[in-house]
From Swiss-Prot:
UniProt protein name: Methylthioribose-1-phosphate isomerase
Role summary: Catalyzes the interconversion of methylthioribose-1-phosphate (MTR-1-P) into methylthioribulose-1-phosphate (MTRu-1-P).
Enzyme class name: isomerase
UniProt cross-references to Pfam families, sorted A to Z: IF-2B (PF01008)
Subcellular location: Cytoplasm; Nucleus
Main localisation: cytoplasm
EC identifiers of the protein: 5.3.1.23
Length: 415
């Protein structure tokens, strides 16, 4: 099992190598795809072989670096017919067009847009390809390193906030949490956003267990006695990121979890052996008033949480916050192909043994299974927009933001 979504060999700035984990093959097959050009980056993002707003921004940026490196080394003959490498203005103009092309791969995720704006500025301010390549390398390294550092901060911020909130309410028992889609290591440079909070909650729980924390090396995040005991990830139809990816990460980290269907949340809340006290979700775009675009199904989960008095948190770095768009009405929601709903992609299984069927290369066999009439019309939005009224807190690397007395978020301090 691998939780390394992006492999970036960067010891030699003039000869970097990039590959991404093909997440469409998980959880049964681990395969990395090399990235050489912007077109490669576009392809893996568009096909959702890589997904998650932070990871999309990183892979998109890395694909630009790889194409720039190839031009610089003259190792990619096909660039010669597209770029005039003897004319920097021509090269810069065509690279700018390539950035627009890359952005069209997943328009809802603001992280990619923000990264491409910064790269466009670097492109504008550099005088030749060598300078651009050098400054882009530094930018991408910083982007990756800060993402991982910020994820750990967000995880601890969100976990501590929840534990202290429960303590103030007089709750000091074991509890469970909900999450949707995948927001962990596979969606970021590591650790995760919403799943990062769950990781921090689990580490806190282990610190309070003398059978686990035998040497006292694990330190609790808060003085609260409550402990997260279980996680309920939603399967997240139609792409099943919850069942394929989040469940995969929870099993890898040995965090107690039970996978549930998207339609069983209310019944699970009423029957859970541990009271469900919070839901943590990620975000592809948070606009100025706190309205949040995230994986389809997030809005209905927020409505359910509000009905049952369960705290609902959005977890995202400040790079996911769009400080220009005033509210959710201005968010463009990507619609996916009908076949992604009418077909289910998975691994062929030996039914009785529940083990993968293998091909002649001893690799699991993937297949697409039809589950709906081919003639049926399909509406398949990739995201929905949760109004800020349904969100209790926005967890960032700089702290947890809550609403004021008038029910409004103020995120201006992040900019």
């Amino acid at each position: 099992m691998s939780l390394e979504a992006i492999r970036f060999a960067r010891s030699d700035p003039t000869n970097v190598q990039v590959s991404v984990l093909d997440q469409l093959l998980l959880p049964y097959l681990t395969k990395y795809l090399p990235i050489y050009t912007i077109s490669d980056g576009y392809a893996v993002i568009k096909s959702m072989q890589v997904r998650g707003a932070p990871a999309i921004a990183i892979v998109g940026s890395l694909s630009i670096l790889m194409e720039s490196q190839m031009m610089l080394s003259n190792s990619f003959d096909q660039t010669q017919w597209f770029y005039d490498l003897l004319d920097w203005e021509d090269t810069r103009s065509k690279l700018t067009g390539r950035l627009d092309y890359l952005l069209s791969s997943r328009p809802t995720a603001v992280n990619l847009s923000n990264a491409l704006k910064e790269i466009a500025q670097i492109l504008k301010e550099t005088n030749d390809l060598k300078q651009f390549n050098s400054e882009l390398y530094n930018y991408v390294c910083k982007l990756i390193d800060e993402d991982l550092s910020n994820n750990i901060k967000m995880g601890d911020n969100g976990a501590k906030f929840l534990l202290e909130s429960l303590s103030k309410e007089g709750f000091n028992e074991e509890f469970a949490v909900l999450t949707i889609c995948n927001t962990g290591s596979l969606a970021t440079s590591g650790y995760g956003t919403a799943l990062g909070v769950i990781r921090s909650l689990w580490n806190d729980s282990k610190s309070k267990d003398p059978k686990v924390n035998t040497d006292g090396s694990l330190k609790p995040l808060a003085s609260a006695d409550s402990k997260m005991k279980h996680v309920f990830p939603l399967e997240t139809r139609p792409y099943n990121q919850g069942s394929r990816l989040t469940a995969y990460e929870l099993v890898h980290d040995e965090i107690p979890a039970t996978l549930i269907t998207d339609s069983s949340v209310t019944y699970r809340i009423k029957t859970s052996p541990y009271p469900i006290k919070a839901a943590f979700v990620g975000a592809d775009r948070i606009v100025r008033n706190g309205d949040t675009a995230n994986k389809i199904g997030t809005f209905q989960l927020a409505i359910i949480c509000k009905q049952f008095g369960i705290k609902f948190f959005v977890v995202a770095p400040k790079t996911t916050i769009d400080n220009v768009t005033p509210n959710g009405d201005g968010i463009v929601v990507e619609e996916r192909k009908p076949n992604e709903m009418k077909l289910v992609t998975g691994t062929l299984m030996n039914y009785d043994e529940e083990t993968p069927a293998l091909n002649v290369s001893n690799e699991p066999v993937s297949a697409k299974i039809g589950i709906a009439p081919s003639q049926i019309n399909v509406w398949n939005p990739a995201f929905d927009i949760t109004p800020h009224e349904f969100i209790d807190g926005i967890v960032t690397e700089e702290g947890v933001f809550t609403k004021d007395e008038s029910g409004k978020f103020d995120l201006t301090s992040l900019f």
